Amino acid sequence: MKGYYHISSHGLEKNDIFKKKEDFVAGMNDIAICVLGFDVIILCFCLMSNHFHFVLYGTMSECRRFSEEYKRRCAMRMKLAGGEVQGMRGVEVKIAFVDCQEYLENVIAYVLRNPLAAGILLLPYHYPWSSAALYFNGGIQQTGESLNEMSERKRFRILKSRVPVPDSYLVDGQGMILPSCYVDSKAVEQVFRHPSRFMMSLARKIENDVEIQLGVAEQVSMTDQEILTQLGDLIRNEFQKESISELSMEQRIRLCLLMKRNFRAGIKQIARITRLDPETVAKVV
């Protein structure tokens, strides 16, 4: 039986899936290729540096197969790009059935709000590695070059695959297949019915509600690098110091609590950044 499903990968703690722009572009293209092999419809998605989210329509088995294939492609790319041996091995990919209209609206907003919740100072519509810009946009058509009109060599250089693609697949100037080619934006517009309702959902802070329902409230949502970019301001505001090395042991203990609360950082992640023993951090948080 077909239905709506939320796919979410557990955040990597020691590495990133997408480290640079080229990785994100490849990750977006992987979505476009993966969806061709399964009987699923993509309503929305968001790629973060260390995890990903999708809301799909299909059977549970097809949605699961799609998510596992996408995870496999991510792992292959990580290994080829940096020699990462572990890649995505052991990374849990959750699949949750969306059982009502309210939950569907909330989980779509949750997926598209991910960058904002992670402290990235962009409206969801302007985050380039998600489908947020596709909805209620007045029918603006994205333009690009047709993949099927390219030479075979150029096409393979972009896709890293020889899989046949529809004539509707267009590529932008950075070699990325336009999300409008493979995301069913009209289905999402039918869910929300009006742009004001969609905007209100994106404006609400719904992370706790959705994560409790998903059972992933303890999931790491930020990488070490993302935390470190904000940690300096936190230390200056709370302790009037410039770096962790200037903090006393008592202040480092308090910093553990602040990192847990502000960044939802895990025990091992806090220990790495503060250079405290994981057992000490566990007792504190």
Predicted regions and their residues:
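Short beta-strand->loop micro-motif that forms the acidic, two-metal-ion catalytic signature
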Residues: 50-58
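Short Pro-Cys-Gly-centered "Cys-loop" motif that presents a nucleophilic cysteine in a tight turn
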Residues: 1-44, 59-285
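Active-site nucleotide-donor binding segment shared across nucleotidyl transfer reactions
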Residues: 47
